[in-house]
C-alpha cells in the first residue's frame, strides 16, 4: 500500500506545474531548512528529496575550475570580434560541456560539487571603462550597445531555447556601476540617473528583457551611498518592477558581510542579512549568511514571508533546471561526455581567437614576405612564445598550441625560426642557488635560514628558526606563524648564480623591509601597502674564489 501511494505521488508530482511543485515542496520544509537553501552551498534535505547542490560555477570563457574543458578567448577578446552569432555558438558549446559534466557528476556520486553545477556566474556585463580595474578583461566592451548585444547572445546560448527547462542558468553580473579597483569592496559609485540609464543599465536591461537571464549578481560597491546588495531601488524597483525580472538575485562573494565590515551600512551580520533579503537579494555565496538569516529571524528583523519569497525564486530555478524531475521531459539530460573539448569546440575556439585579434598598426611589415628570400631568420624572444596563458576563470584544455609551434608550422621551410628564453618576468630564485651556512644547515643546506620573532622589532632570541626554500608565502597563512601576536623575521642565505652576468633582483612584500647584500643595504622601505623594489647586481663566477666572495643575502 505504501509503495502504491508513493508511485502515485511521484507521478502526480512529475506532471504538475513548476509552481505547484514549488508550493508542495515549500510546505515540507522547516524555517531552518528554508534558510539553508538560500546559501550557495545548499545541503541535502533527505525527507524532501532535495540533493545537496552548490550554486557556484564559472564559465567566463569556458567551463572553469572543473578540469578538462574547451577554453575560448577572454570576453574582452570576444568583444573584439563584434560577432553576435559567434558569441552564441560559443556559449552554446559551453553549456553543452556544462551539462555533460553535471550529469557525469550525478552518475558518479549522486550530486554536484562547486564548479560542477548548472548555475553559472557569467556573463560580466560591466563596462570596460578603466584598464586599471582588475576585472576589465572579463568585460565585453566599453560600449553599452555592443556589450548589450553580446551579453544577450551569450545568455541565450547558455540557457537554451526550451520554454520550460533551462539548459543552464546565466547570471548577469555585477549589478551595477562596478568598475573600481581601489575601493572595490566598500566604495560607492556616484552616478546620475541619465548616466545609469544610458551607460550602465542597458546591458543588464537587455539581459533581463530580451535574453530572459534567470539570475543577476549584485555588486560589492554601493550606488549613491546604498550598497548594491541592499539597494531596493536596484533590486526591486528597477529589476523586478520596471524590467519584470522573476529570477534569483545572488550577492557577489561576501558582499552582504561587507554591508557592516566595509560600508558600515549595518551594525551586525544579522542586520546586513535582513537588509539584503528585504531589498530583494535572495541568496549569498557565503556560509555566514546562513547564520545571519537565522539570527535575523530570531530577532524578528525578517519574517517567514520574507524567507518564502526568496525561497520560491530559488526553488523555481532548481526545477527549471530539471532537478527533482523524474518526468524524463528535460531535453538536456542526454548530452554525452564526448562533447567536452571535442574537435568542433576546439575549432570554434580557434575561429574565435583569430577573429579576436585586432591589428592596430602595420608599417608594411605584415604579413611577413617569406617567399622573396629576404627574410631568412625569425627571432622569437621570451617565454610567452612557449607558454599558453588561459586567463582567470579558466578550464584546463588537454589540447593547446604555443605561439612557437604555430609560427614554426606557418613558416615551414621558408625561414629559420629561433626562440630565445630571455626571461623578462619575475621568477622566484630556485633554492639550489641559495645556500645556508653549515652551522644553520642542520635541517637542509638549500634556501634561506628563517628566524621568526613574536615581536615587531627582531628583539631577543628567535621564537622559531627553520629552513625556507623560498620567500614566496604569506606569513598570516603559515601554520607555524598564525598564532603570533606580532611578527618580525630575518632570512639569510648565500646566493651563487648559475652563470656570470648582470642580474635584476626584485623583492616584493609589505611592512618594514631591509635587504642587505654583503652587509651593504640595498632596500630600506616602510609601507603598509605592497612594496616592489628592483636593483641590478653584477655576479662574476670567475671572481668568487679569488677576490670577491659569493653574495651574502640578508632580508629582515
Q: Where in this protein do the model-derived segments appear?
A:
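Glycoside hydrolase catalytic-domain context in secreted enzymes
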Residues: 13-503, 518, 528-543, 547, ...
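Solvent-exposed serine/threonine-rich low-complexity stretches and specific carbohydrate-binding patches
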Residues: 524-526
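Short, surface-exposed beta-strand/strand-loop-strand elements in extracellular ectodomains
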Residues: 508, 512-522
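Bacterial Sec-dependent N-terminal signal peptides
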Residues: 1-17
Amino acid at each position: 500500500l505504501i509503495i502504491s501511494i508513493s508511485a502515485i505521488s511521484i507521478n502526480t508530482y512529475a506532471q504538475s506545474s513548476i509552481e505547484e511543485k514549488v508550493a508542495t515542496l515549500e510546505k515540507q520544509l522547516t524555517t531552518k531548512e528554508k534558510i539553508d537553501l538560500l546559501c550557495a552551498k545548499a545541503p541535502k534535505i533527505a525527507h524532501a528529496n532535495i540533493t545537496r547542490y552548490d550554486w557556484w560555477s564559472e564559465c567566463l570563457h569556458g567551463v572553469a575550475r572543473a578540469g578538462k574543458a574547451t577554453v575560448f578567448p577572454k570576453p574582452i577578446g570576444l568583444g573584439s570580434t563584434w560577432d553576435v552569432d559567434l558569441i552564441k555558438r560559443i556559449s552554446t558549446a559551453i553549456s553543452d560541456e556544462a551539462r555533460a559534466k553535471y550529469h557525469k557528476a550525478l552518475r558518479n556520486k549522486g550530486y554536484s560539487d562547486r564548479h560542477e553545477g548548472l548555475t553559472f556566474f557569467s556573463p560580466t556585463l560591466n563596462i570596460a571603462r578603466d584598464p586599471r580595474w582588475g576585472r576589465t578583461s572579463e568585460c565585453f566592451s566599453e560600449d553599452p550597445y555592443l556589450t548589450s548585444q553580446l551579453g544577450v547572445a551569450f545568455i541565450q546560448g547558455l540557457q537554451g531555447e526550451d520554454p520550460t527547462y533551462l539548459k543552464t542558468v546565466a547570471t548577469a553580473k555585477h549589478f551595477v556601476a562596478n568598475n573600481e579597483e581601489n575601493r572595490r569592496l566598500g566604495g560607492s559609485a556616484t552616478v546620475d540617473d541619465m548616466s545609469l540609464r544610458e551607460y550602465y543599465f542597458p546591458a543588464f536591461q537587455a539581459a533581463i528583457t530580451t535574453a530572459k537571464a534567470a539570475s543577476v549578481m549584485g555588486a560589492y560597491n554601493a550606488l549613491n551611498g546604498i550598497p548594491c546588495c541592499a539597494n531596493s531601488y536596484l533590486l526591486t524597483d528597477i529589476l523586478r518592477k520596471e524590467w519584470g525580472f522573476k529570477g534569483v538575485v545572488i550577492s557577489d562573494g561576501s558582499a552582504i558581510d561587507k554591508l557592516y565590515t566595509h560600508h558600515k551600512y549595518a551594525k551586525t551580520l544579522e542586520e546586513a542579512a535582513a537588509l539584503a533579503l528585504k531589498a530583494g537579494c535572495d541568496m549569498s555565496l557565503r556560509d555566514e549568511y546562513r547564520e545571519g538569516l537565522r539570527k535575523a529571524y530570531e530577532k524578528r528583523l525578517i519574517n517567514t514571508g520574507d524567507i518564502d519569497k526568496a525561497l520560491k525564486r530559488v526553488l523555481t530555478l532548481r526545477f527549471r533546471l530539471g532537478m527533482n524531475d523524474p518526468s524524463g521531459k528535460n531535453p538536456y539530460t542526454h548530452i554525452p561526455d564526448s562533447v567536452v573539448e571535442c574537435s568542433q569546440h576546439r575549432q570554434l575556439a580557434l575561429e574565435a581567437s583569430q577573429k579576436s585579434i585586432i591589428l592596430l598598426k602595420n608599417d608594411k611589415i605584415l604579413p611577413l614576405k617569406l617567399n622573396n628570400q629576404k627574410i631568412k631568420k625569425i627571432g622569437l624572444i621570451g617565454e610567452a612564445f612557449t607558454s599558453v596563458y588561459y586567463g582567470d576563470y579558466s578550464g584546463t584544455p588537454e589540447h593547446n598550441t604555443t605561439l612557437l609551434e604555430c609560427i614554426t608550422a606557418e613558416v615551414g621551410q621558408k625561414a629559420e625560426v629561433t626562440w630565445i628564453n630571455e626571461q623578462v618576468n619575475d621568477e622566484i630564485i630556485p633554492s639550489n642557488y641559495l645556500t645556508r651556512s653549515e652551522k644553520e644547515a642542520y635541517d637542509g643546506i638549500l634556501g634561506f635560514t628563517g628566524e621568526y620573532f613574536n615581536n615587531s622589532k627582531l628583539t631577543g632570541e628567535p621564537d622559531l628558526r627553520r629552513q625556507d626554500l623560498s620567500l614566496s608565502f604569506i606569513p598570516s597563512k603559515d601554520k607555524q606563524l598564525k598564532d603570533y601576536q606580532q611578527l618580525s623575521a630575518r632570512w639569510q642565505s648565500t646566493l651563487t648564480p648559475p652563470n656570470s652576468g648582470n642580474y635584476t633582483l626584485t623583492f616584493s612584500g609589505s611592512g618594514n623591509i631591509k635587504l642587505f647584500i654583503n652587509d651593504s643595504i640595498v632596500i630600506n622601505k616602510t609601507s603598509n601597502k605592497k612594496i616592489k623594489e628592483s636593483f641590478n647586481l653584477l655576479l662574476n663566477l670567475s671572481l668568487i674564489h679569488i677576490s670577491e666572495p659569493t653574495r651574502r643575502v640578508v632580508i629582515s
